[in-house]
C-alpha cells in the first residue's frame, strides 16, 4: 500500500532526524527505513514529494476500486489496536528483540516510548515512578544499545522535559538481557 511519509524540519533538526533514522535502521533494519524519506530544510521538495506520493495513492486506489475516504485494504491486527497501559509490570515484560518480526518489534518499541512519555509527563505515570521507581525496559543488546543511545541523545537535547527547572531524572532504566 503506498503511503508517503516524510520526516522533515529545518537545518537545525538534521542531527535529530539522522538519529531517528539510525535508530530505525539499527533496530528494525533497512527495510523499515525504506518506508519514509528525510528531507531537510526544503519545504518545496517536501510538497513536491508529497504531491507525487498522493498521485501514487490515488492511482493505487483507482486500480483496485478502493475508496479515497477510507483505506479498506489496510488490515491491522487487533493486538496492535489495543491501548498500552504503561505499568511497571507491562514495561518490564515488553519483548524487545531483533528475533521478533519487525512489525512486532516496532509495536513494542512504540509501547516503550509511550511508557516513557507517560512517566515523564502524565500525572498517573509520574505518580507511579515516584512510588515504585523508574520503569525497567528489558531487551537484547542489539535493540537496547541503540535505544539507550537515542534516549541519552534526547536527554542531552532537552527533549525529555520542558526547558528550565531541575535537571531531567530518567523515569526508565535500560536493562540488557541475553539475545533470544
Question: What does each of the following model-derived ranges do?
Answer:
Residues 15-18, 30, 34, 47-50, ...:
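Generic marker of "main functional regions" within proteins
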Amino acid at each position: 500500500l503506498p503511503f508517503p511519509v516524510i520526516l522533515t524540519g529545518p537545518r537545525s533538526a538534521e542531527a535529530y532526524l539522522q538519529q531517528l533514522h539510525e535508530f530505525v535502521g539499527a533496530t528494525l533494519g533497512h527495510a523499515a527505513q525504506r518506508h519514509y524519506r528525510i528531507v531537510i530544510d526544503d519545504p518545496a521538495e517536501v510538497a513536491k514529494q508529497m504531491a507525487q506520493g498522493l498521485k501514487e495513492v490515488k492511482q493505487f486506489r483507482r486500480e483496485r476500486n478502493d475508496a479515497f475516504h477510507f483505506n479498506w485494504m489496510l488490515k491491522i491486527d487487533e493486538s496492535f489496536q489495543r491501548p498500552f497501559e504503561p505499568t511497571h509490570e507491562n514495561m518490564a515484560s515488553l519483548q524487545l528483540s531483533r528475533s521478533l518480526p519487525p512489525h512486532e518489534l516496532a509495536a513494542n518499541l512504540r509501547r516503550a516510548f509511550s511508557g516513557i512519555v507517560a512517566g515523564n509527563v502524565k500525572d498517573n505515570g509520574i505518580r507511579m515512578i515516584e512510588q515504585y521507581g523508574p520503569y525497567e525496559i528489558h531487551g537484547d543488546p542489539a535493540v537496547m544499545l541503540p535505544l539507550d543511545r537515542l534516549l541519552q541523545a534526547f536527554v542531552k537535547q532537552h527533549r525529555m522535559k520542558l526547558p528550565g527547572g531541575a535537571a531531567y531524572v530518567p523515569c526508565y532504566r535500560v536493562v540488557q538481557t541475553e539475545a533470544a
